[in-house]
Amino acid sequence: MLSIIVPTLDEAEGIAAALAALAPLRARGAEVIVADGGSADGTAVLALPHAERVLAAPRGRARQMNAGAAAARGDALLFLNAYTRLPADADRLVGAALARGAQWGRFDVAIAGRHPLLPLIAGLMNLRSRLTGIATGDQAIFVARAAFEAAGGFADIPLMEDIDFSRRLRRLARPACLRAKAVTSGRRWERHGVLRTVLLMWALRLRYFFGAPPDKLARLYGYAPRER
């Protein structure tokens, strides 16, 4: 079984549509688990009709995804941002990749939006990921449960949890880099400026690779999880 784990925090505006898009996968046997980090806008209530389980999880993306994985029944796990849409046959593609011997992988990403640079940025993200074996959350990382447990799950850090997880998984095996596209929202790129966002993300990533603490990077990014 494929378990799709969706961490949420104040996603009321789009969560129903995001989860409704997963209905065909659920009809084919996948389960959807929403791990909510204490939304104040009713996200958890809106998610209830569209998921097998809606969990109240400790706030923080890594904590929420680990909580979802602990509750999941599947032998394959897929971690999906609430603002990212999977390919229609994602369940079959993941199953085929794991059946071929992959231990983990990710999809190519497309960035939805009107800015002409977004397709180029997505293409470079996919190329970089294919060359380095590192995936980001926007690429809908999937993993066999045994590999998830062998890697130790997500580290309890407020930012770069996807990069850290990929690095540990890469020690087990190279990822299956699927060319089918997960489509992620370009809202943060367009809201803050495409070039500015690219430069900020690369600066944060370089600092992380050179040892900067993730909590400091989270503050620079403008993200600091509130305590529950």
Predicted features, each with a name:
Residues 20-29:
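Short, acidic, metal-binding catalytic loop of nucleotide-sugar glycosyltransferases
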Residues 30-33, 44-71:
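Conserved donor nucleotide-binding strand/loop of the catalytic core
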Residues 13-17, 39-50:
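Acidic helix N-cap motif at the loop->helix transition within catalytic regions
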Residues 1-3, 31, 164:
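Cell-envelope/extracellular polymer assembly enzymes that use nucleotide-activated donors
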Residues 21, 36-44, 84:
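A conserved acidic beta->alpha catalytic loop
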Residues 167-228:
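Hydrophobic helical membrane-anchoring modules
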Residues 77:
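Short aromatic/hydrophobic "clamp" motif used to bind/position activated sugar donors
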Residues 88-117:
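Conserved donor NDP-sugar-binding/catalytic core segment of glycosyltransferases
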